[in-house]
Amino acid sequence: MAEKMQAIMKTKPAYGAELVEVDVPKPGPGEVLIKVLATSICGTDLHIYEWNEWAQSRIKPPQIMGHEVAGEVVEVGPGVEDLQVGDYISVETHIVCGKCYACKHNRYHVCQNTKIFGVDMDGVFAHYAIVPAKNAWKNPKDMPPEYAALQEPLGNAVDTVLAGPIAGRSTLITGAGPLGLLGIAVAKASGAYPVIVSEPSEFRRKLAKKVGADYVVNPFEEDPVKFVMDITDGAGVEVFLEFSGAPKALEQGLKAVTPGGRVSLLGLFPREVTIDFNNLIIFKALEVHGITGRHLWETWYTVSSLIQSGKLNLDPIITHKYKGFDKFEEAFELMRAGKTGKVVFFPHKG
């Protein structure tokens, strides 16, 4: 194994990132070193790349970016008993304390002291990466690395879609970015019908149809509320899944959901949002879920089973694959322009 490796690093508090050469790290107690087989870009990585207000408040350069990963264990640190060299793993990227009030009530996904790979510590946009053994998830040997790397964001989509009953229920999804596309795949695999997607990008509307959306609408050209009402004979949808983080999409979705329906919110809004709670939520008796992270480890079992079932239509979602990191800037700029689904790097070019 080489002593040096390439990594995409946030080297300074400014727009962009750099491809650097650094030492291959050594695992400490309770840690393993993985050879990164595949790693995908998340919206969080894009925020860090763009150096928005959230990134400025959270990230401390220099730091290796990235957290969605599939890899092979190549070295085991002291005290690790459940993993060995050669194990094929993905990683739960939220490192929880296990001691806070939430953790002691089995709500690990909302641990009050959560640390995140590639956010609070070095990440996985590299040839090799250190991960805590307790955060490893063993993958079936025949799972493609690009699928295995997507399990972490798929967990977000699964928790959003499956926060309540979905089979046979009319569903509106706002936002067909990478997470929204995963949400469409999960909703269709879980029996939702019809699945209606509101998305302004023509590129992503076409992707949504490929993944399985029954109807798509451009909210900049048509009123999505009227669109939904026409399809549902005026009833509105049973389920509203918000992936966009757009305040207007939230308002439209709340208007389009039927009284007594269910709402799951995953998209992060850029600012405080003003909503008519009385008329859009309280008087409609809506069931509203805020979604963050993944339930440990129930969601991982669900995600793995869905992938192995063959029912998830993931191939159209993975629109760009890169061997190595040489074109990482191109990948990020395409994502910024909304011209991708999921982007996956395969760090080892061979």
UniProtKB/Swiss-Prot annotation:
**GO BP term (any one):** threonine metabolic process
Q: What is its EC number?
A: 1.1.1.103
Temperature curve summary: Optimum temperature is 90 degrees Celsius. Extremely thermostable. The half-life of the enzyme is more than 2 hours at 85 degrees Celsius and 24 minutes in boiling water.
Q: Where is the active site?
A: T44, H47
Which Pfam family name is an example for this entry? ADH_zinc_N
Q: Which GO terms describe its molecular function?
A: amino acid binding; L-threonine 3-dehydrogenase activity; NAD+ binding; zinc ion binding
Q: Which domain of life is it from?
A: Archaea
Binding residues for NAD(+), per the UniProt record? L179, E199, R204, L266, G267, L268, I291, T292
- Residues bound to Zn(2+) 1 are C42, H67, E68
List ligand-binding residues for Zn(2+) 2. C97, C100, C103, C111
Q: Name one GO cellular component term.
A: cytoplasm
Q: HAMAP family from the entry?
A: Thr_dehydrog
- Job description of the protein: Catalyzes the NAD(+)-dependent oxidation of L-threonine to 2-amino-3-ketobutyrate. To a lesser extent, also catalyzes the oxidation of L-serine.
Protein name (database record): L-threonine 3-dehydrogenase
The scientific name of the source species is Thermococcus kodakarensis (strain ATCC BAA-918 / JCM 12380 / KOD1) (Pyrococcus kodakaraensis (strain KOD1))
Upper classification of the organism: Archaea, Methanobacteriati, Methanobacteriota, Thermococci, Thermococcales
The gene for this chain is tdh
